[in-house]
Swiss-Prot record:
Function: Involved in the biogenesis of TorA. Acts on TorA before the insertion of the molybdenum cofactor and, as a result, probably favors a conformation of the apoenzyme that is competent for acquiring the cofactor.
UniProt-listed PANTHER family: CHAPERONE PROTEIN TORD (PTHR34227:SF11), CHAPERONE PROTEIN YCDY (PTHR34227)
Assigned keywords, A-Z: Chaperone, Cytoplasm
Keyword check for Iron: no
Name of the protein in question: Chaperone protein TorD
Organism name: Aliivibrio fischeri (strain ATCC 700601 / ES114) (Vibrio fischeri)
HAMAP family registered for this protein in UniProt: TorD
SUPFAM superfamilies (alphabetical): TorD-like
Gene3D superfamilies listed in its UniProt record: 1.20.120.1820, HscB, C-terminal domain
Location of this chain's protein in the cell: Cytoplasm
A cellular-component GO term for this protein: cytoplasm
Main location: cytoplasm
Length: 215
């Protein structure tokens, strides 16, 4: 495995991790893992990237605060519901259609566009996650899979085409709405854990675009 393919694997893992955080409430077991040496080492290593340092440290700060709550898992689950599962007036709804389509309705053109990406690359949406295709967790899971598929390409031309597809996907399907999604999450997530997650997501996407564009 060369340095670039190893780096791609790390990128995929980060996107899958962020997808998992934004797909459902953390269980008690998952929350306990965030206090483990392995996870804290992962976060510390991520924070060593200067462009990510502030965002990662903000998340670590919120994780530390979570551990001090009396009913940590229940309260964080309530935060998840408040942040993402309310109405568009009270929550930061995690669907691209809510930000990119003038109708303001779910399953609009951005969801159709996402279904086309899934079909083009023969990547299946997880059957147990019954959400519109433009849910943030589905888009991030797709991106992780696209990165892994990139590493599987045999020719240099195919590899470069898949790297280019990643750049297009991030710009068109993610950075077109996640900054606003993060702003609303900051406004409506009073405790701030999920606002820290979406803040890190946007920061990482912007850094990843620079990497993919060769800047």
């Amino acid at each position: 495995m060369n340095e670039l393919t190893a780096f791609n694997e790390q990128r995929a893992e980060i996107y899958w991790w962020l997808s998992s955080l934004l797909s459902a409430e953390l269980t008690t077991e998952q929350l306990e893992q965030y206090g483990s040496f392995e996870v804290r080492t992962f976060l510390s290593n991520l924070a060593e990237t200067p462009e990510l340092s502030d965002s990662v440290n903000a998340l670590i700060e919120k994780l530390n605060a979570v551990q001090g709550r009396e009913d940590a898992q229940l309260e964080l689950s309530a935060d998840f519901c408040d942040a993402f599962l309310g109405s568009d007036k009270s929550s930061a709804l995690p669907y691209a259609s809510m930000y990119l389509d003038k109708s303001g309705l779910l399953n609009a053109k951005p969801a159709q566009d996402m279904r086309e990406w899934l079909t083009k690359y023969n990547i299946a949406q997880k059957a147990e996650f019954n959400e519109p295709a433009d849910h943030i967790a589905i888009e991030l899971d797709f991106l992780g899979n696209l990165i892994v598929m990139t590493n599987q390409q045999v020719s240099e031309d195919e590899f470069e085409a898949y790297m280019s597809a990643q750049l297009t996907f991030i710009n068109e399907q993610l950075l077109s709405w996640t900054p606003r999604f993060n702003e609303i999450c900051i406004e409506r997530d009073k405790f701030g854990f999920y606002a820290a997650v979406t803040g890190l997501l946007v920061t990482f996407l912007k850094l990843d675009v620079k990497f993919l564009a060769g800047e």
